[in-house]
UniProtKB/Swiss-Prot annotation:
Keywords: Carbohydrate metabolism, Isomerase. Converts N-acetylmannosamine-6-phosphate (ManNAc-6-P) to N-acetylglucosamine-6-phosphate (GlcNAc-6-P). It catalyses: an N-acyl-D-glucosamine 6-phosphate = an N-acyl-D-mannosamine 6-phosphate. The gene is nanE. This is Putative N-acetylmannosamine-6-phosphate 2-epimerase. It comes from Escherichia coli O139:H28 (strain E24377A / ETEC). GO terms for molecular function: N-acylglucosamine-6-phosphate 2-epimerase activity.
Length: 229
């Protein structure tokens, strides 16, 4: 059975939660062994897959989890706004470190390596390709190029302002077009994740609300300060 078919079965049985284990950079939690521990806890709690940034983090996580890993490498480039898995060598390193799925930036923006070239390299390794997109046009273009999974990851992050709510309309549009959609980006409550599934999401990735302690504390502190002012 293919990995995609296995995931279809797991999602149907367990609800489709993917946990992104990406600590705040330079946080006390930003250590491969801690990332791996968070990933294992997420797997034991029912996550069907884990999203991991960085080769060292992925190597540590691969050693302890059995669920599929979505691997990415983030870089800050001087000549491109693209940050997620921008280079062939990133794909190769993630493949060697044990990724099952490799996610790349799938937006229509200047980049060092074309999307189709990165997708071909992922498939060369026999892995599934996911594209992190921001618009319906991005997602549909990537689907035509052969990406098996389309993420709404970058919706709201390629524009001057980022909305507070997740982009459910994008989930529905891509799902209606026949894409396997991973809803991602600002899914901070179980109710929002459930809404994404009702809008046609194949799965939902949750990051900050589960694995970024600093963000969660900030949400509580902000709300509590407002309550007493």
């Amino acid at each position: 059975m293919s990995l995609l078919a296995q995931l279809d079965q797991k999602i149907a049985a367990n609800g489709g939660l993917i946990v992104s284990c990406q600590p705040v950079p330079d946080s006390p939690l930003d250590k491969p062994e801690i990332v791996a521990a968070m990933a294992l806890a997420a797997e034991q709690a029912g996550a069907v897959a884990i999203r991991i940034e960085g080769v060292a983090n992925q190597q540590a996580t691969r050693a302890v989890v059995s669920v599929p890993i979505i691997g990415i490498v983030k870089r800050d480039l001087e000549d491109s706004p693209v940050r997620i898995t921008a280079y062939i060598e990133d794909v190769d390193a993630l493949a060697q470190a044990g990724a099952d799925i490799i996610a790349i930036d799938g937006t229509d923006r200047p980049r060092p390596v074309p999307v189709e070239t990165l997708l071909a390299r992922i498939h060369h390794h026999g892995l599934l390709a996911m594209t992190d997109c921001s618009t319906p046009e991005d997602g549909l273009a990537c689907q035509k190029l052969g990406a098996e999974i389309i993420g709404t990851t970058l919706s709201g992050y390629t524009t001057p302002e980022t909305p507070e709510e997740p982009d459910l309309a994008l989930v529905k549009t891509l799902s209606d077009a026949g894409c396997r959609v991973i809803a991602e980006g600002r899914y901070n409550t179980p109710a929002q994740a459930a809404d994404a599934m009702r809008h046609g999401a194949w799965a939902v990735t949750v990051g900050s609300a589960i694995t970024r302690l600093e963000h969660i504390c900030q949400w509580y502190n902000t709300a509590m300060k407002k309550a007493v002012l």
